């Protein structure tokens, strides 16, 4: 508890210190969108957690939300690195990292809250944040040796570096252990050949955690996987042009190419041929933290839809007073609140040392599918305006759909849950 209090004060100090400084060039303050209140008494949050949400919401609605439509339209976040340093100053890039490396030493519930609020302002930037803070930083915290942590964490946590993680390949998505990227040991180095695909933050990343096959004959195949820390600029490593995606536009994604890429043996994360343990343990927490993304998108839909229903008129009255629209509001709200309770409680359990693959898969399965439905309902409430790109409703739908595919598809999540029950009766 004392460590938590210290970390909370540290984060509070960073927030206070940021307020004393003018924003970076290019971050012109704009009138924030009118937000619906979030009842965190019902959500069971502590006073410190409520303050964290309020601080992040204020900052993000002023400095990110007004840019979200343009980020989506252009598929580019022009001020990404400056914004990343602002997040670093706020202490949220390394929110679960130890204080000794510059982190805030907080828990997964706080991580989910920040993920939610960033996604509320911009789903795309929220996804990039999740890849950086959880897939990269948290994996280094949990699996890196002391030298690796001292070398990489401070710059990743400050926002000087951008991080990523690379598992998937063109023919190895859900079946990730069938990956073909090969790592051959030669002296004190490994030579990597192959490629990775659909890598979030790939075009921008300075540090990447990359999984490769070090034993092609291993049975089962999962026993021959090793995790490596790869730096931008290493000989033989390059990236292709960023992908033109349906949604999450501005969260840059690309193919990684390895052509006789020379990686020092000291850059193995964990142990040789034991990368599957790094991968699978990290996947549970990835699903948990990324579940904050659909929460933020659902809240954004409500932020825009509920006020609209009480401004738009038809048949001589505000359309929000029609019973069919009241039903839409009720459905959207209850889906969001049910998802929040599930996600927050699983996060609390993980903070207390009780983390299950079944429920980490469950929270993103349920919240992702609810987010898609809530976005569809929001479009319906907007009517013709919901189908026009001058309004953000289409963006919410396109962004929400990613969470039914990334971090393991909805189908794979159902398998994880079903197999967990089967194991109880084996």
Swiss-Prot record:
Family per similarity comment: Belongs to the acyl-CoA dehydrogenase family.
Impact upon substituting residue 407 to E: Does not affect isovaleryl-CoA dehydrogenase activity
Active site: 286
Catalytically driven reaction(s): 3-methylbutanoyl-CoA + oxidized [electron-transfer flavoprotein] + H(+) = 3-methylbut-2-enoyl-CoA + reduced [electron-transfer flavoprotein]; pentanoyl-CoA + oxidized [electron-transfer flavoprotein] + H(+) = (2E)-pentenoyl-CoA + reduced [electron-transfer flavoprotein]; hexanoyl-CoA + oxidized [electron-transfer flavoprotein] + H(+) = (2E)-hexenoyl-CoA + reduced [electron-transfer flavoprotein]; butanoyl-CoA + oxidized [electron-transfer flavoprotein] + H(+) = (2E)-butenoyl-CoA + reduced [electron-transfer flavoprotein]
One GO BP annotation of this record: L-leucine catabolic process
Cofactor(s) recorded in Swiss-Prot or TrEMBL: FAD
Enzyme class, first EC level, given as a word: oxidoreductase
Disulfide topology: none
Organism: Homo sapiens
Alphabetized InterPro entries for the sequence: Acyl-CoA_DH_CS, Acyl-CoA_Oxase/DH_mid-dom, Acyl-CoA_Oxase/DH_mid-dom_sf, AcylCo_DH-like_C, AcylCo_DH/oxidase_C, AcylCoA_DH/ox_N, AcylCoA_DH/ox_N_sf, AcylCoA_DH/oxidase_NM_dom_sf
Function summary: Catalyzes the conversion of isovaleryl-CoA/3-methylbutanoyl-CoA to 3-methylbut-2-enoyl-CoA as an intermediate step in the leucine (Leu) catabolic pathway. To a lesser extent, is also able to catalyze the oxidation of other saturated short-chain acyl-CoA thioesters as pentanoyl-CoA, hexenoyl-CoA and butenoyl-CoA.
Span of chain positions assigned to the transit peptide in the UniProt entry: 1-32
Disease: Isovaleric acidemia: A metabolic disorder characterized by retarded psychomotor development, a peculiar odor resembling sweaty feet, an aversion to dietary protein, and pernicious vomiting, leading to acidosis and coma. The acute neonatal form leads to massive metabolic acidosis from the first days of life and rapid death.
Compartments in which it is found: Mitochondrion matrix
EC numbers, comma separated: 1.3.8.4, 1.3.8.1
Sequence positions bearing N6-acetyllysine: 58, 67, 78, 241, 262
Pathway: Amino-acid degradation; L-leucine degradation; (S)-3-hydroxy-3-methylglutaryl-CoA from 3-isovaleryl-CoA: step 1/3
Residue(s) carrying N6-succinyllysine: 58, 67, 78, 262, 318
Keyword Transit peptide appears in the UniProt entry: yes
Full protein name: Isovaleryl-CoA dehydrogenase, mitochondrial
